[in-house]
């Protein structure tokens, strides 16, 4: 039986153009659960699931902002917002997956672990916050908040001013031993949601930091920790492409890790979207993973069988 870590993209939870109601998100999650159930039952895989949380954290920060302004309820820090949305999305995925498996006559234990991700307090990202989060403000309000709260703010593409936070590299997960133990006991585990809650270690203690960790890079670290055979990133396109959007665009099928590294260094993959996915795939195969896959959520089973998507191998 092979072990696979599946990193779900945002489209598994919220589609473009949707408002983000609970009903919309749950319907998307139910469709995703069918794909995961197919993988578990048809392919006989041990599955660990991770997921994004960008839109949900964004909405939660807006809720907290409004609550503070209207009702005087203190807003919670970013790391707490990350933990809250891990619980929210993990609950939805877990429930949908249990229900889907039961429909097929299968009882399997599913557990969501609110996960802390260790980062280096000396990571250069802390000196260069770059990840926009939360609501848009006018310039005066943004600069006032920056002064009051110690935030870094930037103008975001002419749409207003926003807070930016660091995006440090993940080093590992505090709960890794628990996750491994559950997987070994036959649990389907949902972990490291949204890249996990970023924490640093100071004088032997863990401390949450206000940052955002890329969920695919954190998912890759999780795949190493559980000693996965395959790391599969599911998104809204059917793989990675070079010369994307140009006349000579070429979608990558089976590709060696050395070829993919060359394309990555040549700048073919956009920083905020495909770039981290490709980097995560490279890291996993270089670590010793059998194969990394980047593919469309709708074709997950075929991609795992190697029939579609970008298949990253050693040679």
Curated annotation (Swiss-Prot):
Top EC group: transferase
GO MF terms, alphabetically ordered: ATP binding; carbamate kinase activity
Compartment(s): Cytoplasm
Keyword Nucleus found: no
Catalytic activity: hydrogencarbonate + NH4(+) + ATP = carbamoyl phosphate + ADP + H2O + H(+)
Keyword Transcription recorded: no
GO biological process, any: arginine deiminase pathway
Keywords: ATP-binding, Cytoplasm, Kinase, Nucleotide-binding, Transferase
EC nos: 2.7.2.2
Family: Belongs to the carbamate kinase family.
Oligomeric form and interacting partners: Homodimer.
Protein name in the entry: Carbamate kinase
Lineage: Archaea, Methanobacteriati, Methanobacteriota, Thermococci, Thermococcales
